[in-house]
């Protein structure tokens, strides 16, 4: 067990903090490529100091919200996409832990990491509906650009502490890229 200083300077034991329940979304186009956005870094957030900033959409599940509903809400809030159809839901939740220097700081200092339920969708719309900066509905922009990426490349594009999550997600949904 190792402790780290939180935002107040008090020591924070990661084991004492819960995982934040979240959803993750792999959106594939008709060519089997995956949508990835380059994160805008906010000082003190989980991406602060990172150079590998490409990620798929993800976000928190609101209290009482169904994960499938949360996935569609997060997708719209972050990308503006609505023209999607569900391909598959991962059977298991996937956890990641924040690196020690971010425990007690990132994720509002309340979580040790995230537990994520992943969904794969097919994008069936026109790319003109994709809006990231600004995204629709007055939501805060999380990405400054986006691209369709080969699925196999994703683990090497994400911040290192999320790499194992992306390796599991790619393994789960690999058959959908064919």
Swiss-Prot record:
One Pfam family per UniProt: NUDIX
Keywords of the record: Hydrolase
GO BP, one annotated term: nucleoside phosphate metabolic process
Residue positions of motif Nudix box: 59-80
Enzyme class: hydrolase
Highest taxon of source: Bacteria
Family: Belongs to the Nudix hydrolase family. RppH subfamily.
Known role: Accelerates the degradation of transcripts by removing pyrophosphate from the 5'-end of triphosphorylated RNA, leading to a more labile monophosphorylated state that can stimulate subsequent ribonuclease cleavage.
Name of the protein: RNA pyrophosphohydrolase
Species for this entry: Brucella melitensis biotype 2 (strain ATCC 23457)
């Amino acid at each position: 067990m190792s402790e780290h200083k939180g935002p107040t300077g008090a020591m924070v034991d990661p084991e004492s903090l819960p995982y934040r329940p979240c959803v993750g979304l792999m959106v594939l186009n008709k060519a089997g490529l995956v949508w990835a956005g380059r994160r805008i870094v906010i000082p003190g957030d989980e991406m602060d100091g990172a150079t590998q900033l490409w990620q798929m959409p993800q976000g928190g599940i609101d209290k009482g919200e169904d994960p499938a509903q949360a996935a569609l809400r997060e997708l719209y809030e972050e990308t503006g996409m609505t023209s999607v159809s569900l391909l598959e839901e991962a059977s298991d939740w996937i956890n990641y832990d924040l690196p020690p220097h971010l425990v007690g700081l990132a994720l509002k200092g309340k979580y040790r990491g995230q537990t994520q339920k992943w969904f794969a969708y097919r994008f069936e719309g026109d790319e003109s509906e994709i809006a990231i900066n600004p995204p629709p509905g007055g939501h805060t922009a999380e990405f400054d650009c986006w691209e369709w990426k080969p699925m196999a490349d994703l683990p090497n594009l994400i911040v290192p502490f999320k790499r194992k999550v992306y390796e599991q997600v790619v393994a789960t949904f690999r058959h959908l890229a064919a």
